[in-house]
């Protein structure tokens, strides 16, 4: 079964990496955004995003 795609949004790259590494180990596909504007752009481009953190 394919896991959900998750968008991680945080202005601190270390925090994004920490969350991404954890979720990737659990089998999720993870996208990253630096801020809200970038997150909205990614969200509208990729209709498979199931969760935004």
Model-inferred region functions:
Residues 8-9, 19:
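Intrinsically disordered, low-complexity peptide-like regions
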């Amino acid at each position: 079964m394919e896991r959900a795609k998750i968008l991680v949004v945080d202005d601190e790259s270390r925090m994004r990496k920490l969350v991404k590494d954890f979720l990737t180990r659990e089998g999720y596909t993870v996208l990253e955004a630096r801020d809200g504007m970038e997150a909205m752009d990614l969200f509208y481009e990729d209709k498979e995003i199931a969760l935004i953190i």
